């Protein structure tokens, strides 16, 4: 079944982008948050323009003071331009814009707490971006004067401007280097913040569990990839695109005037040509988004199939299932490569279009500018400047056409990450709805009129169950599929679908031990202390807990601080005993045991249950063995259609 959504460059894509990107800069729970964010970005840009205004005036003053020959003889037009910026109305306008910018940020200070870094870095990047654009404009004039002086054989002017060019390069190198460094650091900080944000929400309200159990939406495939890779791609590409768009706008504004002064026809023709090219690129981009989306999903499926083999290598080896696993892995590889073949075709089509689009634009420049030169209406240096201005504007206007492959890939990431973001926001709301089990805090476990349903349906696994476990231990029995494990999960508080009331200790006083205990990636000390942090228990306490379960040899064989793959080193029986050692060490009020002694012999099983009784830990068990009866005093047998039988043992 294909769950791929419909893709388009539309409002849905824009909304998902904003909802994912905005929280780093401005909280989403503020009234009119999107409008306020837009205003802050605009006033930041306008404030930089105002600062640039005053900087150019200052630069003109410094050049006129220390290099009067340059401003009077070589660049008189620059001096005229600087003097025009000294108009009182322009000065007042820039001061007003700066005041509005300061006021806008001041009124939103309470919303920008812990968000000073992104705004500071963004402000620095915008300043550097204006500086780079200014350098490009200045270099276009320098190249113009250099070529004109060569053509007219004005040696002195040539050498003077060559020195100016050298100075401009020396000035440009640190600015460009710092500009690129700041962009990369901004992306790094954004990725760190957004990843932490997603991870914290992923572990809240058991989202990781609900998504994995497919109880809400099967479209959220490979959340690990979305967190680790899609966020990285989103932050880096978003930053690149937004800065490139701003740079394109500055370039268009800066160089269009130069191009328009040389040839109005060339400027108009360029705009029409770019509009047609962009329209064609967007049409092809719609198809590319779907292909990129599928490629990300299929590559993740292929990678997961290899991880699945690694995690289940022993079972595969016992079953001699190598041939089947090879077929499964290669099937996923084939699906990824098949989609990649389609991607190659469309990439080739777009590459051909981009090549023709870029190279055909050389003809208008030759056709329209050359006659002006032959008619002696422009000098030779103006041709060079026309080339520079034309291709600067052409590149800026063609940002969509030239980047359509990256934009399509980026849009696919937005859909994946945006969908994941929406689901992480939806789950807490789902958990707060009325069709959920009501939980109360109590020292004992009691259930009142409890009905447990399957995810996304009204089918009852258990209906109207009531019992009280004061000084009693419960054994749950029944055929496979009648809801035994679901009831344990409901009592634990991780399965909330249904109705009724459960009273139980808080989460810190409940421990769950499944048939195959969870082995964390850590040391032996971390393993037995889990879920508490390392250092919570002394070495003697840990050693005593292991000794009670007959596992003291693990310290001698492996060391307490050695990090190993415990799920592979230990047998299932050893893992189950280690799980009981965790319970003995952590001393919860109640233990939830889901066939937790299935791999133990009778001696170790009896020892484990005896330790629970000796430490006054109440427990609820699921099991099939008849010898489990002696460890419990209450039996609950579940049958199909939600019915049950509750009796004393």
Q: Predicted segment positions?
A:
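Membrane-integrated ABC transporters
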Residues: 1-165, 179-183, 209-237, 241-244, ...
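Cytosolic ends of transmembrane helices, especially the final helix of ABC transmembrane type-1 domains
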Residues: 294, 298-302, 317-321, 327, ...
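ABC-family ATPase nucleotide-binding domain "signature/switch" substructure
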Residues: 527, 561-649
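Primarily ABC-family ATPase nucleotide-binding module
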Residues: 71, 75-79, 215, 219, ...
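Conserved "ABC signature" C-loop
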Residues: 517-565
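Helix-to-loop junction immediately C-terminal to a conserved catalytic motif
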Residues: 492-493
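A hydrophobic transmembrane-helix motif
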Residues: 127, 171, 175-180, 243-285, ...
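Loop segments that connect adjacent transmembrane helices in multi-pass transporters
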Residues: 291-342
